[in-house]
Amino acid sequence: MSEKVVLAYSGGLDTSAAVKWLQEKYGMDVIAVTIDVGNEKDFTLIKEKALKVGAKKAYVRDVRKEFAEDYIWKAIKANSMYEGVYPLATALARPLIAKVMVDIAMEEGATAIAHGCTGKGNDQVRFDVGINTLAPHLKIIAPARQWGMTREQTMEYAQKWGIPVPISVKNPFSIDENLWGRSIECGLLEDPWNEPIPEVFAWTRPVEATPDAPEYLEVEFEQGVPVAVNGEKLSPLALIQKVHDIAGLHGVGRIDHVENRLVGIKSREIYEAPAAVVLIAAHQALEAMTLSKSQLRFKQMVEATYSDIIYNGLWFSALRQDLDAFIESSQRFVSGTVRLKLSKGSFRVVGRKSPYSLYHKGMATYDKGDQFDPSSAVGFITLWGLQAKLQAQLQPILEEEKGNKS
């Protein structure tokens, strides 16, 4: 009896070709697994295609709710933005996909897991590290990393075996999408000087096609988790979709970024993430009101590390769990509502309120009702500047700090 390999199957070029290649190269029975993390795809057709191209069995697993509650919500609490720009949509989904693949491999008694990642991308690291962490006994096969074919040659290989492919040499964009965002690469986008053509975008309107009137959006949070939009309590999936639709209508969420990949190269990436950029910005605004200065400063360091952990494929690491403990604690009082104004491809926070706000109007105002005692400032300034004053008296100041008198 042939050994079984569980293949992460998207229905695209690489994984469709991989079904036949795995059978040819290893003589294995291929079990295709397609994971729904919010992809806008016809999963019935993908399952049928997997069987048609030679898979012995095909699974479709809907994990959207788990993705939102156990991954996206954590990313919001951590304000996760790789290099301050990318909200990590693809990177966030990979550990969940790896987990489901391992679960099915165990159920099926498979000896290997295969994926369609190339040798240049980050996803190969995310899948391999995740699988090795969860099930080190399983063999990992990456056909696109091993077969040595160019994209055009892969198309020819697929056509040779009668495998339909959804792309052409003239329009060779590689697209990945889920609840949290959409990434587009390859083709003309590989030249960072080229402006993305309109066909690259699917979720966000071009500025010239957005409404002339701005739109206000209110997002309510409970302990760091978004729970309502414009006063309406929504499920996680419905809430993300609601913000996605409103932000996309106004052209919000386009990202054009030259990114430092984990494998050591720079890559030009185009992203659409309307819900992600709006919800993270709203969350940051609420934190600015409810966390102390020292909490915010320390959390910013944690956020950078947390984002790197996600990007670098270390979701299942002990460090991520440790940082989660701090982040969860920091969200105890991050409850309230943030109002945003969206218009013509941009947005900004225009209001925020919280029962746990550390903003005290009586202390901040310069008008009637001022409760701040200005006489307290004198003693504070004396003590605050004492060390700098003493050091200047006891140690010579560098000449360049004094200014060149000659």
From Swiss-Prot:
Pathway it works in: Amino-acid biosynthesis; L-arginine biosynthesis; L-arginine from L-ornithine and carbamoyl phosphate: step 2/3
Source species: Dehalococcoides mccartyi (strain ATCC BAA-2266 / KCTC 15142 / 195) (Dehalococcoides ethenogenes (strain 195))
Upper lineage: Bacteria, Bacillati, Chloroflexota, Dehalococcoidia, Dehalococcoidales
HAMAP family for the chain: Arg_succ_synth_type1
The protein's name: Argininosuccinate synthase
PANTHER family the record matches: ARGININOSUCCINATE SYNTHASE
Pfam families to which the protein is assigned, alphabetical: Arginosuc_syn_C, Arginosuc_synth
Domain of life (superkingdom): Bacteria
Keyword Transmembrane: no
Matching Gene3D superfamilies: Argininosuccinate synthetase, chain A, domain 2, HUPs, Single helix bin
Similarity annotation: Belongs to the argininosuccinate synthase family. Type 1 subfamily.
GO MF annotation list: argininosuccinate synthase activity; ATP binding
Location, primary (coarse class): cytoplasm
Residues annotated as binding L-citrulline: Y86, N122, R126, S174, S183, E259, Y271
One of the GO BP terms on file: argininosuccinate metabolic process
